[in-house]
Amino acid sequence: MWSKRIRYLNFLILFLTANVSAEYKITVLATNISNYGGFGEWSFSALYESDEESVLFDTGFHEDTVLHNAKILNKDLSKVNKVVLSHFHSDHTGGLIKLRQVYKELNADAFSEVYVARGFFDQRYYKDGSMEGPGNYRDSSEFKKAAEEEGIKFIILDDFKKISNNLYATGTVERVVEKYNGPKGFYLDKDLTIPDIIRDDQSVGMLTDNGWIMMSGCGHSGIINTAMKLQSIKNEPVYGAIGGFHLFKASDNTSLK
């Protein structure tokens, strides 16, 4: 049973830092709860740190949130060269360009290598016909242009990719158990005939001696589907999950399953 294989780790306080393996230290830099002078918002960002390198997963909503929270936690983000974005939504991509602008002055490669899943740059439309794109941009192509002008290179993934030692981006997640987990009313065409199922939703898996620890931005691909994708990379148990699961409207019965 999947319910026996995944232990949900609930983060109730911003800046909860966990040593979940000897290799990486994880620090949550943005979520909807704040404490001790930090900024809280509807968003997500987390930092992986090892002796070898630092990797950022998602960049928060407002451009200054991750910058501020990292500063008060004494986290040196100038060491971050690689970023994994879970999906295009602005509450996960809003800080990227500002982070690059600030830290490239200290490290020319800072925030320059960004991994996204196929479909990230698809143009989206609200049900009223207005456009929606990444990073607080309405037009996806404008976001891409602005980021690339700052020296950011996007690596588009169709399948999983090893980002660092024992750290993997899932790339595209096959929708096996659940086809879509997320908001409705968004489309991929101006005529509003093709519903957006956020095919670019991906997660990060960290391989430890005990198995996989999964980090999800929103879980639009479905948490079980994502766990299955990690096990297709290496058949180890998924014993921990961190981040957003988009289960806030789910019944208790659904959440427990």
What are these regions (language model features)?
Residues S112, V116-G151, G171, R175-F186:
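Acidic/polar short surface loop at catalytic or gating sites that assists cofactor/ion binding
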